[in-house]
Every structure is written in structure tokens, then in C-alpha cells.
């Protein structure tokens, strides 16, 4: 679970899918899934979906991974801002966020080459937003960041989200 061929992502975006940010203790008691095509996710005892990694050559789609994660008990996750719309379209609603912290930058992130992305904390609601829906434009990134104050750090943003789950 902690190894990943970063060549399966575009070089520009490989850092965004960082399974190395979790250590062994995060997986104790977790339900771990690895598809035949090498895509992964895990669901912790408290319903946190971690290590979502879609192998580009896998037949299984990203939305199918999330559906399986929810069926396995997943009800929340956090992700870099670049995945914002993907999670909105797949039943997750943003709750809180914090600024990118270079001290916790994932392996492969290069300062100056890639824009630092905020970390967004989502809860599962089951409501799938499409670009055609009015709600989508009300919750879109720009609106979300205007409406929701930035949390001072990762733990604070996580706590805010967890109170809503």
C-alpha cells in the first residue's frame, strides 16, 4: 500500500496522489482495497478514506473506487484542491480547508514548479453535483473559499469536518 509507481500519474500531478503520507499505524484495522489493475484505497476504523490512488492503466474508474470505499464504511476524506470537482461529482461535500504546508509536502512536490494547493476536507453526503446543477456553482471552489474561513492548520480543519460527520 505504501508503494506507488509515480510514473502512472502525470509528472506534474503525481505528488497529488501521495500514499506515502500515511504511516503503518494509519492502516491498523483499516479495510484495504487493491484492484486487479493496481488502484488502491483504504478505509480507517473511523471511516476516513485514505490512499485513494487510481492506476491510469486500470479498467476500474475513479468513481467506482469511491463507491467501493463508501460501501466499505468510508464517510470522509481530505484531498488537495486539484481534486475538488472530482469529489463533488462523486457525493462528497467540502466542509473545511487549510493552506498547503511545505513542511508536510508530499514526495515529488517541487517548490516553484507546482503551485501549492490547499487541503480540503470532505464529508460524504451522497449528493452528486454536476456542472449543470445550480448547487454546483454555489459550492464551486471559488465560492467555497469565500464562504468558509481557512483553518489554522490540518488538525483544526480535520476536527471541524469530523464534527459534521
Regions found by a protein language model. Name each.
Residues 27, 33, 41, 80, ...:
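Phenylalanine-focused residue identity feature
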Residues 21, 33, 92-93, 98, ...:
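A generic structural signal for solvent-exposed, polar alpha-helical segments
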Residues 102-161:
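C-terminal "cap" of GNAT-fold acetyltransferases
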Residues 1-73, 140-165:
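Glycine-rich short-loop/terminal segments
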Residues 44-118:
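Acyl-donor binding region in acyl/amide transferases
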Amino acid at each position: 500500500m505504501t508503494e506507488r509507481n509515480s510514473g502512472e500519474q502525470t509528472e506534474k500531478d503525481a505528488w497529488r496522489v501521495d500514499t506515502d503520507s500515511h504511516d503503518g499505524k494509519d492502516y491498523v484495522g483499516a479495510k484495504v482495497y487493491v484492484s486487479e489493475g493496481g488502484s488502491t484505497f483504504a478505509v480507517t476504523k473511523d471511516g476516513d478514506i485514505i490512499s485513494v490512488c487510481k492506476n491510469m492503466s486500470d479498467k476500474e474508474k475513479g468513481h467506482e473506487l469511491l463507491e467501493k470505499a463508501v460501501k466499505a464504511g468510508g464517510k470522509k476524506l481530505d484531498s488537495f484542491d486539484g481534486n475538488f470537482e472530482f469529489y463533488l461529482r462523486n457525493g462528497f461535500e467540502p466542509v473545511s480547508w487549510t493552506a498547503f504546508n511545505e513542511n508536510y509536502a508530499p514526495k515529488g512536490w517541487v517548490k516553484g514548479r507546482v503551485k501549492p494547493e490547499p487541503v480540503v476536507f470532505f464529508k460524504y453526503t451522497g449528493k452528486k453535483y454536476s456542472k449543470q446543477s445550480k448547487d454546483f456553482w454555489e459550492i464551486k471552489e471559488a465560492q467555497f473559499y469565500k464562504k468558509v474561513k481557512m483553518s489554522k492548520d490540518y488538525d483544526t480543519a480535520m476536527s471541524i469536518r469530523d464534527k459534521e460527520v
